[in-house]
Amino acid sequence: RAANRVVGNVAQGLGVDSACLEVAYGGLTLEALQPAVIAVTGADALVEVLTAQGRRYAVNTYAPLALDAGDRLSVNTPQAGSRNYVAVRGGWSVAPVLGSASTDTLARVGPAALAAGDALQVGSAAGLPPVALAEQAAFAMPRADEEICLDVVLGPRTDWFDQQSLELLCSQAWAVTPQSNRVGIRLQGD
C-alpha cells in the first residue's frame, strides 16, 4: 500500500490496493516503454536506474521516481528483508481473477505469472492526486544474518503435521532456502 500511496494511486477507484509487482529476493529489471512515475518499497535493496542515455544512478525507496521511455529500473538483492513492491502511477492494468491480481502458482489460480520480456500495461493517471514526497518503512527489516522469532499460526493444512512434527517446528532454528516464493517459505532445519 505504501508504494501506491507514494505514486498517488488513491482516487477514482484505484485505492491503495492497486496491483503492485512483488519482487522476491531482487533480480528485477524493468524498462519503461513510455514516461512513468513509479515507487519501490519494502526490503532494503539497492535500486538503480540506467537511463536511455547510459547514465546509472541509485534511487531512494519509498519515494516517487520519474522514468523516461527507455530508462531501466533494477531492484537488486536485498540487504535486509526479502520482498520489494513496485507501483506505477495509474496502476498496472491486469485483469483480476477472483478479485485478485495475484498469481498463486501452487493452486494455479490468478493471472499468468510474469516472465522475462512481458510488456505490462499502465492505467490512466488522469484525476489522481499529486504524488507523495516520500514514505517511511513501517519497521526495520531483518538482515539475512539476523535470527528472528516468529509466531506459528496453524492453517488449513494442519492435518499434514503430527504432534512430533509441530514440536520439532517450534524447537529449533530454521533457515529460509532459495526455493521459497510468495506462496510459501521453504525452511532448512538443523
Roles of regions detected by a PLM:
Residues R1-D190:
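Conserved "landmark" site that anchors the functional core of diverse proteins
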